[in-house]
Amino acid sequence: MAAVQAPGEKINIQAGETTQVGDTDQQRNDWPEEDRLPERSWRQKCASYVLALRPWSFSASLTPVALGSALAYRSQGVLDPRLLLGCAVAVLAVHGAGNLVNTYYDFSKGIDHKKSDDRTLVDRILEPQDVVRFGVFLYTLGCVCAAYLYYLSTLKLEHLALIYFGGLSGSFLYTGGIGFKYVALGDLVILITFGPLAVMFAYAVQVGSLAIFPLVYAIPLALSTEAILHSNNTRDMESDREAGIVTLAILIGPTLSYILYNTLLFLPYLIFTILATHCSISLALPLLTSPMAFSLERQFRSQAFNKLPQRTAKLNLLLGLFYVFGIILAPAGSLPRL
């Protein structure tokens, strides 16, 4: 005779047991703590999203925008605060989205682990789908800002689109798609994207045209920005090698990585010394940050890589700001094209 199922009961055919409907919820509550994300307040969630962006690295975006705007002001006498703000938000959005893409693909490929600097997904601070959605939002925000810049600026659409989408593609393809980072081309992508390209973008939207000389002025800043990435890749050399990826630091080894880091660190100071000697003494302002550079060199030499990328980013920010101030304070006509 068929068994009668009481209301609120489920029959477990395999086990031959009867389970109350409420038992399922009870079982979920009995899951191991590590398998369930703890309940967090909205403030904690917002903090998690902000930390996932790696805000300490944003100097690599802000200083090129400031430099390009300063070059526009000194060469053409134009500086629209609306364009400056829109450009800064657009570049920061693309940079932040690129960091999230990096987090997602490094986790997907098994590169990030419990000892990694970025443990956003490893420690389940955010879920992969959260990172993807946030990245899409930031790329969308960047495109909205680019449209806003086109509305305000006299720069041709094709020129604005070429620079902006060139930077956007670089930020995504660094680890997404082709994954330039994994085939030792990431340094080149970052050197171009967060150096000449970002400076040119900020300059062009202000003056409404392209020029070559902003690319030249971007060189010291680009070298300093590359030092951030190289210190990061040198720190992660062993874990990257175990994961089967190839970075420039892995290709050249520890000794040449140390030499390259010093070159990226100190070559900008040589450039500033030449400019201060032959053009304007105001370009000596960035030399005030040289004690920080020597401190970073000692830290790299002793292989104390903890927080080295963050400290290098701090130097990059101060170096860039003093560089911008030096250009603004230089007498008219003392610098080439300014």
From Swiss-Prot:
Residues 15-24 have a biased composition (Polar residues). Its EC number is 2.5.1.-, 2.5.1.39. Residues 1-39 are annotated as: Disordered. The chain crosses the membrane at residues 83-103, 134-154, 160-180, 188-208, 209-229, 245-267, 277-297, 315-335. One of its GO terms (molecular function) is antioxidant activity. The modification N-acetylalanine is found at A2. GO terms for cellular component: cytoplasm; endoplasmic reticulum; endoplasmic reticulum membrane; Golgi membrane; membrane; mitochondrial membrane; nucleus. It is a multi-pass membrane protein. It catalyses: menadiol + (2E,6E,10E)-geranylgeranyl diphosphate = menaquinol-4 + diphosphate; all-trans-decaprenyl diphosphate + 4-hydroxybenzoate = 4-hydroxy-3-(all-trans-decaprenyl)benzoate + diphosphate. Keywords: Acetylation, Endoplasmic reticulum, Golgi apparatus, Membrane, Menaquinone biosynthesis, Mitochondrion, Prenyltransferase, Transferase, Transmembrane, Transmembrane helix, Ubiquinone biosynthesis. One of its GO terms (biological process) is ubiquinone biosynthetic process. Residues 25-39 have a biased composition (Basic and acidic residues). Its main location: endoplasmic reticulum. Pathway: Quinol/quinone metabolism; menaquinone biosynthesis; Cofactor biosynthesis; ubiquinone biosynthesis. Signal peptide: none annotated. It is found in: Endoplasmic reticulum membrane; Golgi apparatus membrane; Mitochondrion membrane. Prenyltransferase that mediates the formation of menaquinone-4 (MK-4) and coenzyme Q10. MK-4 is a vitamin K2 isoform required for endothelial cell development. Mediates the conversion of phylloquinone (PK) into MK-4, probably by cleaving the side chain of phylloquinone (PK) to release 2-methyl-1,4-naphthoquinone (menadione; K3) and then prenylating it with geranylgeranyl pyrophosphate (GGPP) to form MK-4. Belongs to the UbiA prenyltransferase family. This is UbiA prenyltransferase domain-containing protein 1. It comes from Rattus norvegicus (Rat). The lineage of its organism: Eukaryota, Metazoa, Chordata, Craniata, Vertebrata.
